[in-house]
Amino acid sequence: MAGAVRGMLEPGGMFGDFRVLKELGRGGMGAVYLLKDEETGANYAAKILYPEAEIRDHKDAVGRFLREAEIAMAVEHPNLVHVYAVGRDPETRLGYMIMDYLPGGSLHDLIMKRLVLKQGPLPIRQSVTLVRQIASALCAVERSGVVHRDIKSENILFDEEGVAKLTDLGIAKRTNAGPKDMTLTLTNVMIGTPAYMAPEHLMDSKKVDIRSDIYSLGIVLWEMLAGEPPNAGLTTSELIAKASRRKRIPDIRTKRPHLPRRIVILLRKMTSPRAEARFQHPEEILTFLDEYAERTRRNFQMFFAGVAAVSSAVLLLAVWILLRAH
């Protein structure tokens, strides 16, 4: 939607108790603004729906907007974007959602920046840390009876300290969805981002569950380690055809040959084309990563113990040689 949208917020103006600082971006349903609380000085992000005349399916857009706010306010976790308020401004009649402002950009931005600067893909340790944070968020999502359905690097944002936050619950689905939720879900045929979708999601969006989110997070891990998603460049039709044959994504070692074996196993387990062969719950990812960290720690201890033993032996040999010489 090019140019200014009539009736939207203007930088420098007021929106309730907030000063509008600037527009952060736009999407198909609305725009996001940076707001400042005039009383506390704190910054927030505000997602504002376009006026009714600007959105073709305004009723559905409002439904998705309110559902995102409802789910986000119901699911609390340090690695989920927090929504503080939702409503309709009495003066402008614009629908709004006030949430955390995350100045660190997205994971997608970080990956692209590293490639532009020729720094290569993300380090293993950083990639594992980020997967741990989002898997932890998924634990809270699952406990709340929700499936995210659109986990991708663009929906993982960073705060000022570099902590990852999962956002965009606009197409999330409750596992106990009623008829109203199903109507919202089925408005569009394709729900989510095809390059990150699990095979069952690509073939039938009604069959997704938390294991589909785990698959998508595995694709994000592959992207962090390789610099791009494994199926980059494939069309949606090609992705669906591949999903129907239950074909695995390419081996990460074709892009990064010297990855630790346990990381390769983690990726294969997260991205199995068959849901029953994946981790069944995000807690299992955390357990796997705990075991990986402990194994790595023990290996380092054994390595340094070996180095110390060799150093001691060399020192003793040197002393013995000196004594023999005298």
Language-model features: where?
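Conserved N-lobe ATP-binding subsite of Hanks-type protein kinase domains
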Residues: 31
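A short, aromatic-enriched beta-strand patch in the conserved N-lobe beta-sheet
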Residues: 85-87
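Conserved short submotifs of the Hanks-type protein kinase catalytic core
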Residues: 92-106, 110
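C-terminal lobe helix-coil module of Hanks-type protein kinase domains
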Residues: 167, 193-294
